[in-house]
Amino acid sequence: MGLQARRWASGSRGAAGPRRGVLQLLPLPLPLPLLLLLLLRPGAGRAAAQGEAEAPTLYLWKTGPWGRCMGDECGPGGIQTRAVWCAHVEGWTTLHTNCKQAERPNNQQNCFKVCDWHKELYDWRLGPWNQCQPVISKSLEKPLECIKGEEGIQVREIACIQKDKDIPAEDIICEYFEPKPLLEQACLIPCQQDCIVSEFSAWSECSKTCGSGLQHRTRHVVAPPQFGGSGCPNLTEFQVCQSSPCEAEELRYSLHVGPWSTCSMPHSRQVRQARRRGKNKEREKDRSKGVKDPEARELIKKKRNRNRQNRQENKYWDIQIGYQTREVMCINKTGKAADLSFCQQEKLPMTFQSCVITKECQVSEWSEWSPCSKTCHDMVSPAGTRVRTRTIRQFPIGSEKECPEFEEKEPCLSQGDGVVPCATYGWRTTEWTECRVDPLLSQQDKRRGNQTALCGGGIQTREVYCVQANENLLSQLSTHKNKEASKPMDLKLCTGPIPNTTQLCHIPCPTECEVSPWSAWGPCTYENCNDQQGKKGFKLRKRRITNEPTGGSGVTGNCPHLLEAIPCEEPACYDWKAVRLGNCEPDNGKECGPGTQVQEVVCINSDGEEVDRQLCRDAIFPIPVACDAPCPKDCVLSTWSTWSSCSHTCSGKTTEGKQIRARSILAYAGEEGGIRCPNSSALQEVRSCNEHPCTVYHWQTGPWGQCIEDTSVSSFNTTTTWNGEASCSVGMQTRKVICVRVNVGQVGPKKCPESLRPETVRPCLLPCKKDCIVTPYSDWTSCPSSCKEGDSSIRKQSRHRVIIQLPANGGRDCTDPLYEEKACEAPQACQSYRWKTHKWRRCQLVPWSVQQDSPGAQEGCGPGRQARAITCRKQDGGQAGIHECLQYAGPVPALTQACQIPCQDDCQLTSWSKFSSCNGDCGAVRTRKRTLVGKSKKKEKCKNSHLYPLIETQYCPCDKYNAQPVGNWSDCILPEGKVEVLLGMKVQGDIKECGQGYRYQAMACYDQNGRLVETSRCNSHGYIEEACIIPCPSDCKLSEWSNWSRCSKSCGSGVKVRSKWLREKPYNGGRPCPKLDHVNQAQVYEVVPCHSDCNQYLWVTEPWSICKVTFVNMRENCGEGVQTRKVRCMQNTADGPSEHVEDYLCDPEEMPLGSRVCKLPCPEDCVISEWGPWTQCVLPCNQSSFRQRSADPIRQPADEGRSCPNAVEKEPCNLNKNCYHYDYNVTDWSTCQLSEKAVCGNGIKTRMLDCVRSDGKSVDLKYCEALGLEKNWQMNTSCMVECPVNCQLSDWSPWSECSQTCGLTGKMIRRRTVTQPFQGDGRPCPSLMDQSKPCPVKPCYRWQYGQWSPCQVQEAQCGEGTRTRNISCVVSDGSADDFSKVVDEEFCADIELIIDGNKNMVLEESCSQPCPGDCYLKDWSSWSLCQLTCVNGEDLGFGGIQVRSRPVIIQELENQHLCPEQMLETKSCYDGQCYEYKWMASAWKGSSRTVWCQRSDGINVTGGCLVMSQPDADRSCNPPCSQPHSYCSETKTCHCEEGYTEVMSSNSTLEQCTLIPVVVLPTMEDKRGDVKTSRAVHPTQPSSNPAGRGRTWFLQPFGPDGRLKTWVYGVAAGAFVLLIFIVSMIYLACKKPKKPQRRQNNRLKPLTLAYDGDADM
């Protein structure tokens, strides 16, 4: 009861609503009889009691999903939990007590905790996809024509497994790492493919030569039925054939031989052998008794030992010769047996023969596994191999089964604590070589010469070698001791990417020392003002370094001298300098007359700098200057001009420095009482200057010497840094300093200022010594391990080492050799093995007890079988194990052979003689002979030469050969240079890639029969050579740089340009031209900023001349006039204007006036001085500000004279007239400037500041500097010119093995790789990275089966027989279309006897010859082409299939019931094609044509095309078309010819063809009533309808009588009127009104040329 209640409760879980009891499930109210029936049922009471005792529950247990597995350790033992709660059946949660506690589910369970390392232990196992099953869909009907196939679904089994134990595991473990793979997938069930067969062959000949027979024709299967397609039709068709009546009686009986029985032994072998051994012992005793001679006994003993050894070898063979029998029957043409007497034959076939008892191959048990070949641990390829072997115990004899494998290998891992890691290998590199620039030079640059001081971007190389990576490698190269490095290994051991062997580098370019111009000569001063001893002084001039030199031998070692000195007398360190003269103060307080001018002075030092006045206390103070203040009516003179610049910098015998100053007359004196003006000579003064002699001295410094060790400093053995470079010690440098007189040479040192003498000694750094570091020698290369017969060349082995650090700074040189070689030890003589065959044993016949019942048998003679022993021998005859011969000695010789013990009636012949010698040319023959022996000479049957030929002939070998070239020419190949191992590292340069080479064409040699032979027979080395040229690349060639142009501005910052012109374009892969100028494609520009000193040239004016009055007052000599002065352009120097130059060099706008209007005061007038300079305008300029200049009154006017004018003159400040603003302007960047010795690399771009006036004119920078304007621009920036790195290639690899081992098409290939891609304007990589060369032609020899002979049944007409075939050695040229030609077997002597990959030669096999009247299967057809399953030419992925078939041949119709079934065999294939099948049809011949199905490759087939789309082959109409002018159409209905219309009957058949009438239409142009006739062409085109009726018009134009109806005429007239209206409207719409002609503006548009940038355009 309880169990039932629990079941009910569990069944109620999850119900949608509460279940109150069983009765609640019934519909209420129930009929009373039914209710009583329920209560009275057996068990009903129990159910009711149960419902009362245990009411259905309203509460159920609910569970959540299991949580994550938790645990301390991985694997089993984890715990996972889930939530459990009590819920009402309506879904809401309630207390746990409302549910039954006994039924509470577990909230905790054990689980498997998955960890990351479990990924290696567990994985999904994917089962194979099962067969594709169709998806059943009743709503979709299958189409009549299958296009692609039917959609299906296929499933597979998936399970999580533990990989090492191959046991299932929980899916959750595998799902932790990878989602569960798909269980099912969509698939395609292709369309059904019916069997497709070929066309029938031609009919065979009649089976009988007389009487009634059968002839047949067959076809073969092209494609088998697939995917449920229909089976194949009959492959054979028969028809009865009649020949001429038979004259004799038809042969009704045939002798039939059955198959041979299994080979068996005649008697118990042990009994027979025991009896034989007993007899042999007695025989040996008798022999030993009879032999007394000890030498004879020794010979017998050796023979016994040899026979015993042979027996030991023969234990592997155990050959037993038995016998087998067969049955011979006489059967009639219906296949029933008859008495042998019906088969009339002279000699019956033998029913017995000797045979070999079949023995299967027997092998021993497996040996123990060998140790693992890998004795170390390697993470990359951890597995090694281990081997176990077994030996042969019994060779197979007479069995087709081969022996199993004697060796088995499996992967293994070396395990245990003592396993060491395997050697790993990695690349190492040598030190980079010195940076070199010359490899980057173009051909043109290299030819230009000096390449010694190149700098800038360069290239450096290093070598790469392979070492064992897990040795203790050299960590750093920084000590003086011998450094150890790993020895180089074979490069093939390193597998990672090879490090770069080239890289770009940079050699700092030396910058030249740049100095400022010389300053002006200073005053005579002491060498040292702090030590003023003696009276010797020097006048000095100086210059400074404006750009420090870099990259030279010293910081200032390459600079010219910066100071020049001239000896002088009376030196002074300080002196007074007059600033200006004061006004002339008359003496004694008078207003005019003699007076003095006081000079305003400052104290200056020898450099011209103002200093404290106290320092000039020893100097002579300037005294006041005497002057005259003019009185009225006195002559008035101007003030003295400044002294001119000195005419010479020094004074000598022929030169003397002079300075001039002048003054002019401002006003003449009056006639009465005034002081007169002096004469003209008094208006000019000359004084000497630069009186020192022209002997200039300076200190001249030589270059700094080599840095030598300073023992006083370098005792500290430490590494220091000096200017950022590491050094091991401090050294000392010296240089020579001499005193030099300019233009003379060296003089004594006292002539030069000693205190200003440059240094002669300075400290320097001694760079660390670097010794040559070489790796240890590599291992010796291996000598040939296996011996080669006939290889007499001397083998050598070598070893090498690599320089990883070159010596530097006086380190130890590389003196030891880098390469050693020695001769290999002579290899041991090759040990070869051979089979030794022993004598054939006696011929063993079938026992007489077996053959005595056979008619014609004779005891002791007849056919038998004999065996022989074979042993394994070394080449020298020594004993060897049988396994050596099995491995090295080729196929096992035959162990048995058929033999014959001649009977009395048999023909006996001698053995064949040797072939006679060949005499004569090609075409001669040689013979061999044999003769009959004994009584055979007299027997007639033995004299039959067909059965027993006594002479054989064969053609002699012919030695006529001809050679002919084959194949294409090879690439042009340069001769390989000799590779020398140099001391030091390789320097990467240009590899020779051009010049004269050779190309090769293979030569083939053929004999007189057209068979390919070795090329040596034609006295050829295998090639035709032809010289060829690989054109050398020519780089782009530009001209030399032109001279720099003049600076574009004569004042301020401009640009200067130089250019190159294109001389020659690159060709043959030379360096391309740099990017050319966009305007002129043939020119390359280089633009740099330049600065022209605005004060370089200046206008110099002489004083104004005396004002020449134009209207002369004879009494006063005064009034208006003109005065002039000379204006010259002078070159400015530090000492002032020096030389007169052309006027165009000075600014014409700034040229001072050369003449002006003047006013000469009268004697009584006021005289004022020259106007002073204008004051500066206040910036910014505006009209409200003014500038002024002033003049001083010199002579006061007389009483009657004119008073003095205003001595101050003002003018407004106008912008760009007399007032200017100034601002900085920055030029564009120059092109990247490199050193003259650099090709590429780091350069510098410069720009310059320019001070620009507000009117746009460049002025001297001092104007902007005076205003303190900001200068925030960077004037220099670094730049990079990409280096033109030529493409660098590796050496050519060795020639590969020939792609073909023989034949005409073999090629050898060698490759090279890019080791350095080209960069910038470097020479690009050539496209030819592979070179091919034909291999020497070798004949292709192989073994080939001959054709099977017909089935031969010995001495019978039918039954079981044999067929045989031969193997022959054939030669071909390896091409597919070459027919193989048979040659002597000696050419295939070195080729393993394998045909089609099979070592077992099948030269004989049993066959069955059908008896007359038998029904039999024909031979297999050849395999069909591989055909894929495709749709619209697209493979569906089901693989290909091939098929072959065997048709049935019937010889007698009576035996059809005995015929076997035709056979079909298929196999899968992979290199198939998609084929399509289409219906083809010939042209109609009458009412019929031929229709057939054709495959896309042109084969006619049956069964490949869809039947429903087959075209008709017959188009005859029923009933026939008998009406005139009718014909039968392709739709098999009658139609009328052209020009006639059909008249149909009520049942839609053609009644008659009526001629279509002519419609007469009047023409529009002709009003005379001309008519045009028009006849409708096919007015009623036929149409096909379901009823098969011809097409008819809806409105019939013809009446029942065949005439046109009336409405047709009305329609024709209306159509004609409509046509006239349409034509008229078109004419009016298209007609254009006349317009006045406009004159066209034929201005030519500018022609735009699309310029492609080619300089040749």
Swiss-Prot record:
Glycosylation sites per record: 234, 332, 450, 500, 679, 717, 968, 1043, 1182, 1225, 1276, 1366, 1500, 1547
Ranges in coiled-coil conformation: 267-315
Free-text domain note: Sequence analysis combined with the expression of constructs corresponding each to two or three adjacent TSP type-1 domains suggests the presence of 21 TSP type-1 domains; not all of these are detected by standard bioinformatic tools.
Record's keyword terms, sorted: Angiogenesis, Cell membrane, Cell projection, Coiled coil, Differentiation, Disulfide bond, Glycoprotein, Membrane, Repeat, Secreted, Signal, Transmembrane, Transmembrane helix
Highest taxon in the source lineage: Eukaryota
Region (Disordered): 265-311, 1570-1591
Tissue: Detected on kidney podocytes along the glomerular capillary wall (at protein level).
GO biological process: actin cytoskeleton organization; angiogenesis; cell differentiation
Residues that span the membrane, as ranges: 1608-1628
Disulfide bonds: 435-505, 455-509, 466-494, 635-677, 646-650, 689-694, 707-764, 728-768, 739-752, 772-814, 783-787, 824-830, 972-1028, 994-1032, 1005-1018, 1036-1073, 1047-1051, 1090-1094, 1213-1219, 1232-1279, 1240-1283, 1251-1264, 1287-1325, 1298-1302, 1335-1340, 1351-1407, 1358-1411, 1369-1388, 1415-1459, 1426-1430, 1469-1474
Stretches in topological domain Cytoplasmic: 1629-1657
Extracellular face residues: 48-1607
UniProt GO cellular component terms: cell projection; extracellular region; plasma membrane
One Pfam short name: TSP1_spondin
Post-translational modifications reported in the UniProt record: Proteolytic cleavage in the extracellular region generates a 210 kDa soluble form. Extensively N-glycosylated.
Signal sequence annotation: 1-47
The protein, known as: Thrombospondin type-1 domain-containing protein 7A
Domain TSP type-1 residue range list: 57-116, 120-192, 194-247, 360-416, 423-510, 512-574, 634-695, 696-769, 771-831, 832-904, 906-959, 960-1033, 1035-1095, 1096-1163, 1166-1220, 1221-1284, 1286-1341, 1342-1412, 1414-1475
Biased composition, class Basic residues, residue ranges: 269-280, 300-309
